[in-house]
Amino acid sequence: VLTDAEKKEVTSLWGKASGHAEEYGAEALERLFLSFPTTKTYFSHMDLSKGSAQVKAHGKRVADALTTAAGHFNDMDSALSALSDLHAHKLRVDPVNFKLLAHCFLVVLARHHPAEFTPSAHAAMDKFLSRVATVLTSKYR
């Protein structure tokens, strides 16, 4: 559970990022594919080249889902329920991949917002992204 101070940190930092949803989401996915090539197997139907319209579109969807999560700290389970169902029952994404993508988002945020990416903001974002990953994998059981 995020503390009020952590929620404030996430809201502040993600507020700056959410206006760049497509850019940051695509960058996080590109970093994921480069750093962890096995993750590409879930996207064999997409053009994964740098700057691909499909990667940008999916990156925006991912970032928009994080915006939804950031707006529903106290009811994240219900806010992300459909997305959790999709990933668990249809896409069957290996749960470890959510952690890998979360790390890539942390790198993107640190790169674009170095002044705001303080140790406390880093810790809060990491905790938030871990919570999102937990929610998305909650229906795997």
UniProtKB/Swiss-Prot annotation:
Q: What is the effect of changing S12G?
A: In alpha-1 A variant
- Asked if Metal-binding is a keyword of the record, the answer is yes
Regarding tissue, the record states: Red blood cells.
Q: Which UniProt keywords apply?
A: Heme, Iron, Metal-binding, Oxygen transport, Transport
Q: Which GO terms describe its molecular function?
A: haptoglobin binding; heme binding; iron ion binding; organic acid binding; oxygen binding; oxygen carrier activity; peroxidase activity
Provide GO CC annotations from the record.
Answer: blood microparticle; haptoglobin-hemoglobin complex; hemoglobin complex
Q: Which Pfam families match?
A: Globin
Question: Which residues are noted in the entry as O2-binding?
Answer: H58
What InterPro entries is this protein classified in? Globin, Globin-like_sf, Globin/Proto, Hemoglobin_a-typ, Hemoglobin_oxygen_transport, Hemoglobin_pi
The record's subunit annotation is: Heterotetramer of two alpha chains and two beta chains.
Q: Supply the PANTHER family for this chain.
A: HEMOGLOBIN FAMILY MEMBER (PTHR11442), HEMOGLOBIN SUBUNIT ALPHA (PTHR11442:SF48)
State the protein's purpose: Involved in oxygen transport from the lung to the various peripheral tissues.
Report the sequence similarity comment from the record.
Answer: Belongs to the globin family.
Protein's name in the database:
Hemoglobin subunit alpha-1
* Organism per entry: Tachyglossus aculeatus aculeatus (Southeast Australian short-beaked echidna)
